[in-house]
Amino acid sequence: MLRIRRDLVDAIVAHARRDHPDEACGVIAGPDDGTDRPERFVPMVNAARSPTFYEFDSGDLLRLYREMDANDEKPVVIYHSHTATEAYPSRTDIKLAQEPFAHYVLVSTRDPEDYELRSYRIVDGEVTEEPVEVVESYMFANTGSDDVPDA
């Protein structure tokens, strides 16, 4: 399951709308501590500048991975948009998926009034859709706690 903050979902959708009709792409980095928590939104430039394909700029991607390494982070979410189709990985998306522990998030912007956001694990060409839980904060997400600290 992907648990992700509302502000990060809003940022993905805004990026996808801004780059439409081209596919948007980016990464959400998080601590490399086993929490699987997306934290730092990193919109990237689609080097392909295409409505049907995305490609990270190799120099930008190298800089991002060096930055994540220096910050003890990992790519928790790798996202991109589909501008005219559903939010499901294409054969190319599946072939290029190289991070077996990342959540691959797709957002469809084919409807100008709404969006579809889905998350997948892609490992060795196998696509598994996973539930997405959108939360306001990770502080109390799925703990059974309320928003009021104990006295």
Predicted feature residues:
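Conserved beta-strand-loop surface patch within small alpha/beta domains used
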Residues: 1-75, 84-151
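Metallo-beta-lactamase
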Residues: 81
